[in-house]
């Protein structure tokens, strides 16, 4: 085995090794999820070298420099104050969703007007209009980290795959018998998964546009789906109160997560694929062992439905957003609530961490988005200006740009 090169992954911190084995180029990753600004770099490199024979003594200084770069990134933009950069009158009818590509250079909006629009983040200029759906475009996603394709799911029961650069439609995926309300690319960007009100999810081949398999088993609408980091598992959350874990290669059921007593609102894996987090209208979130499907904790405290939930990039923190107007931060290790985020005057429908994991972004029906300190729960900033409910808000990969989407038909870029 011969080491060819290093690649850095900033969030969550990690080093990818490209190496040659029997004439074939392979990659492996060293996850540094515990890396912090005060980590002893020399001791860490020593530890890595004990476990990884590819990193020989001659590479020691190089690896130290790489880890120092990762440390610097963790501290960047941590005290960033956001200012309104642009208001985009994005569509003539209400927006449904907003998604950013990985670099944050462009983003996409979906709308009730049956179109999607691609926007340049730096200028706020429209790049392309994606036309062809015959009903509301509800679900949208980029094939991050590549970002050269986008998928759109519609109430017209189809999903379309588009070129980001040209706006050309590559494929129209047909087969669902009801509205498509969620979708996701696998990390390898070879498959698109779609979830529908017809109670099924489907996997589609990006290259040839063919259906790979149908995931059947839910008895009610599927409203949430996501792949794990390695792309070999997919989870679907349904109005039937259950979450199902599927084998992404065969389409077979791996586990059924039964425990919630109302509709599921969100379901996702943590970074290392060991845990699954589910949020429900029953006012709780549950943590599950991703291998055996057993519930390991129930996160309680909210007085109303959980509308969104998420892990930070490392999987150490969990955030929950509720119709009770508050958000909460939990430790994934102790399962204890470490902060309660109070200040919104309406339900919170969206929540996400910045890539560095020290800030939280919430969007609410009170027409504002807020930035919070993820350790203390203190509100650091209120993003005001929308004239109707905010249903979508997201950080870019660097954590220095925020996009908000509202029922007032506008999108705002904050930087």
Swiss-Prot record:
GO terms for biological process: intraciliary transport; outer dynein arm assembly. It is found in: Cytoplasm, Cytoskeleton, Flagellum basal body; Cytoplasm, Cytoskeleton, Flagellum axoneme. Pfam families: WD40. SUPFAM superfamilies: TolB, C-terminal domain (SSF50960), WD40 repeat-like (SSF50978). WD repeats lie at residues 90-129, 132-174, 175-214, 217-256, 259-298, 301-340, 343-384, 386-415. GO terms for cellular component: ciliary basal body; cilium; cytoplasm; motile cilium. Its main location: cytoplasm. InterPro entries: G-protein_beta_WD-40_rep, WD40/YVTN_repeat-like_dom_sf, WD40_repeat_CS, WD40_repeat_dom_sf, WD40_rpt. Keywords: Cell projection, Cilium, Cytoplasm, Cytoskeleton, Flagellum, Repeat, WD repeat. Belongs to the WD repeat WDR69 family. Required for axonemal dynein assembly and ciliary motility in ciliated organs, including Kupffer's vesicle, during embryogenesis. Facilitates the onset of robust cilia motility during development. Interacts with IFT46. This is Dynein assembly factor with WD repeat domains 1.
